[in-house]
Swiss-Prot record:
The keyword Repeat applies. The active site is at 228 (proton acceptor). Converts alpha-N-acetylneuranimic acid (Neu5Ac) to the beta-anomer, accelerating the equilibrium between the alpha- and beta-anomers. Probably facilitates sialidase-negative bacteria to compete successfully for limited amounts of extracellular Neu5Ac, which is likely taken up in the beta-anomer. In addition, the rapid removal of sialic acid from solution might be advantageous to the bacterium to damp down host responses. It catalyses: N-acetyl-alpha-neuraminate = N-acetyl-beta-neuraminate. Pfam families: NANM. It is an enzyme of class 5 (isomerase). The keyword Repeat applies. GO terms for molecular function: racemase and epimerase activity, acting on carbohydrates and derivatives. Residues 1-19 form the signal peptide. Homodimer. This is N-acetylneuraminate epimerase. Keywords: Carbohydrate metabolism, Isomerase, Kelch repeat, Periplasm, Repeat, Signal. InterPro entries: Kelch-typ_b-propeller (IPR015915), NANM (IPR056734), NanM_proteobact (IPR019936).
Amino acid sequence: MNKTITALAIMMASFAANASVLPETPVPFKSGTGAIDNDTVYIGLGSAGTAWYKLDTQAKDKKWTALAAFPGGPRDQATSAFIDGNLYVFGGIGKNSKGLTQVFNDVHKYNPKTNSWVKLMSHAPMGMAGHVTFVHNGKAYVTGGVNQNIFNGYFEDLNEAGKDSATIDKINAHYFDKKAEDYFFNKFLLSFDPSTQQWSYAGESPWYGTAGAAVVNKGDKTWLINGEAKPGLRTDAVFELDFTGNNLKWNKLAPVSSPDGVAGGFAGISNDSLIFAGGAGFKGSRENYQNGKNYAHEGLKKSYSTDIHLWHNGKWDKSGELSQGRAYGVSLPWNNSLLIIGGETAGGKAVTDSVLISVKDNKVTVQN
C-alpha cells in the first residue's frame, strides 16, 4: 500500500463543492438502511425509528418525502434491496413484544406504488443483524452477521441484571472474553427468491463470517470488505465472491485498513474503481487479541477513519480522505459514484449530510 500521499492529492480528494450532494436527511441518520431504484433514494430505520423517506435525485426541487411507517418496529442494522420494483427489508435488531432486544430473521416488502408494507410469511434460517445483502440475477443474497442465539442471550442476561452494575460488568466480561470462532458469526451464503419467498443455501465462506462488513457488487462479482471478526475486534480482510460460470468461487484479496480493520465502512464503484472509505474500529485491538487478550477492545476508544482506499493493480492504495471520520451510514451507487448518506462521527453522533466519492484516472474527488 502506498502510505505517502502528496498534499495536492489530498487537496483534490478532499475537495468539497459549493452545492450540497443531497438535502439533509429529515433526522440525524445512522444504523439504518437504504436502497436506490430508478434514481429515487429510499432510507429508513436506525435512528429514524420506524420512519422511511424517499428522494427523487432527478427532481429540480430535491426534498425528502415521508413514506408509510415500517410496521415491524424500530430496528438497527437491517438491510434492504430493490427487486422488480419492490423494496425488501431483511432482519435487524429491535425489541420484541416483551420489550427484549433481539435479532430478527423476518422479511418485509414495501410497494412504492401503493405506499404500503406487508410482512412476508418467510423467515431466514438464521438471524439477520450485522449481515450484508446484495442482489444478483433477481435474487437477494445474505451473508455474515451475528449469531442469533448468542446475541439474544446476551441481551436477555442484561435485561435480568437490571441496574446491577456489578452483574452487568460480569455479563460483559463473559460475553467479550471469547475467541472469534466461539461467536459463530454467519459464514453461510443464503439466497432469497422473491417470487417464491423461499430461502436457500447458496454456499459458505471457506474462512469465517463477519459482522458490519461493507458490501458492493458489479456484474458477477461481489466484495465484502472488513467488518467485525467478533464483538469489538475488526478484521482487515477483503473477500470476493465470483458468480462467473456455474460454480461460486470465494477469493481472498489483499487486506485494507490494516492492521486493525474497521466495521461500518462504505464501499462502491466509480469508473470501474473499487472504493472503500471510512469505518470505525479500535486501534490496538488486533495486537491485544494476538497477544492472548480475547476482550481485545477493553479500555480502547473507538476511532473513526477518514481514509479513502482504491483497489488498483492488485493492491489497495490510500487515495484520499473524508472531511471527517464516519461509519454506519448507507452506501449507494449513484451517478457512477459512491453515495454515502448519514452515518455517525466521533462520539457516535448521528449526522444528516451526504457525501459523494468519484474516481477518474485513479484520482478521488469528494463532494459534501
